[in-house]
Amino acid sequence: MVAQITEGTAFDKHGRPFRRRNPRPAIVVVAFLVVVTCVMWTLALTRPPDVREAAVCNPPPQPAGSAPTNLGEQVSRTDMTDVAPAKLSDTKVHVLNASGRGGQAADIAGALQDLGFAQPTAANDPIYAGTRLDCQGQIRFGTAGQATAAALWLVAPCTELYHDSRADDSVDLALGTDFTTLAHNDDIDAVLANLRPGATEPSDPALLAKIHANSC
């Protein structure tokens, strides 16, 4: 009995040969799964990244009995990308709190100073006093402050840009309710490094375009 089990046989008890298993269905299933997996990976790798659109800022409140508040002319992202950013030590930035979160302007001003911006100040936003700026925020500047605005825009790339009538080179960063922290990645760091004292290489226009194409 043991010998028969050990030796085995190719026939059943009626003397008929055992049927061999057909491997074709298993091969078909495996091939199908391989194809499906390849298609899924191809779609995942070739799909363009989702680009988050920043919320449009609400207009400023209009005080009764006074002239309407004018933010200035909104500047397009395309036009601003062509502006070369200023050296960080030459910047004059005012961080304005319009988010309703106490102390946020001071925190962001400190973070800007850590990056190399020259002694940013912090205060409440007089334009949105008594209300909140429901968006990422706004960068407001005059003609003399365009380069500073371009440097500031590197770390606040989702803000709206407004060219106003101020004559000096100061720039306001008004923080909205959606603003959480300054932007940070390897490309931004590379550009900021070229804007610090001692740097001799100019900012790379292609890198600037890449930063602002992928931010919002």
Curated annotation (Swiss-Prot):
ATP-binding recorded as keyword: no
Pfam families: LytR_C (PF13399)
Residue ranges crossing the lipid bilayer per the database entry: 25-45
GO cellular component, one term: membrane
Reported phenotype of the disruption mutant: Loss of the gene results in increased sensitivity to nitric oxide (NO) and lower growth rates at low densities in rich media. The mutant has substantially increased sensitivity to two distinct antibiotics that inhibit peptidoglycan cross-linking (vancomycin and meropenem) and to rifampicin. It also shows increased cell envelope permeability. The mutant is highly attenuated in mice.
Subcellular location: Cell membrane
Assigned keywords, A-Z: Cell membrane, Membrane, Transmembrane, Transmembrane helix, Virulence
Stated role: Contributes to cell envelope integrity and virulence.
NCBIfam families, per database record: integrity_Cei (NF035953)
Protein name as it appears in the record: Cell envelope integrity protein Cei
Protein's organism: Mycobacterium tuberculosis (strain ATCC 25618 / H37Rv)
